[in-house]
A protein has these predicted regions:
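Short, hydrophobic/aliphatic alpha-helical segments
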Residues: 1-11, 40-42
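A structural-propensity feature for long, helix-poor, extended segments
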Residues: 41-84
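Contiguous domain-boundary segments centered on the initiation and propagation of an alpha-helix
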Residues: 66-115
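A conserved regulatory-domain signal marking ACT and ACT-like small-molecule sensing domains
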Residues: 77, 89-94, 109-231, 235-238
Length: 238
């Protein structure tokens, strides 16, 4: 158990589950999209749906979508900043099935780019992402994370793992899912540190890889992680 588990995260209140966790989930969705979104739709499940306004979940989700970390004081005026940056957003209630009560599905758009991420806020600012664009994956935002869409072909996972190992980077977790045999597949890979630029470029051009995003670790505050909080800038790889 860490000190964070005892005292909770540094954040704009009132609730680590409903504010810090929600903000981090939206921030991860933004990085998965790869650019500043122009449209955001939040489908709120369970406790999130019941307390979205009272606990600031709606503000936290919009702030994370704009690039903010949970300790950013501008979360309180996230709706105003969203208007300034041309972000259209709405939130609805939804039954997402047998999942954690603090769960949200985040659908982001920008031009012809779209991403849908579903995750849960587990308490203490901790989060778990378990679905991306219909693929069952698993990552926490506590490590740099690679999201790789590829064709379900023998050897792809091994080749990706070899590139990571050759870059002297250790894999913390690797989860793979596919729609059907021989069809589209997705990997979520948590790693101990970000890949070098050459390794990242090599992965993007690897045979059978069709899409790649590199997500930063989001469990630290905005200063430590050099966030692009509420800036509207593009920060992810193409």
């Amino acid at each position: 158990m860490s000190l964070l588990d005892v005292i909770g995260p540094v954040m704009v209140g009132p609730s680590s589950s409903h504010t810090a966790g929600a903000c981090r989930l939206a921030l991860l969705a933004r990085h998965a999209l790869g650019v500043a979104p122009t449209r955001a739709r939040f489908s709120l499940h369970g406790s999130f749906a019941k307390t979205a306004r009272g606990h600031g979940t709606d503000l936290a989700l919009v702030a994370g979508t704009l690039g903010a970390f949970p300790d950013d004081p501008r979360i309180a005026r996230a709706f105003d900043v969203a208007r300034e940056h041309g972000l259209d957003h709405d939130a609805t209630t939804a039954d997402l099935g047998d999942v954690h009560p603090n769960t949200v599905r985040i659908a982001l758009e920008a031009d012809d780019l779209r991403v849908s991420l579903t995750g849960s806020s587990l308490g203490g600012g901790l989060v778990k992402v378990f679905e991306l664009d219909g693929f069952r994956i698993d990552f926490s935002g506590a490590h740099p994370t690679l999201l790789i869409r590829h064709l379900d072909t023998p050897g792809v996972i091994a080749r990706v793992a070899r590139v990571i190992a050759d870059d002297d980077v250790n894999i913390a977790t690797l989860v793979s899912a596919r729609r059907k045999r021989g069809g589209e597949a997705m990997m979520s890979i948590e790693i101990d540190r970000p890949l070098s630029r050459p390794a990242s470029a090599y992965l993007q051009h690897l045979r059978y890889v069709t899409w790649l995003r590199e997500l930063p670790e989001v469990m630290q505050g905005s200063d430590a992680a050099a966030a692009v909080a509420l800036s509207g800038r593009t920060e992810a790889t193409p």
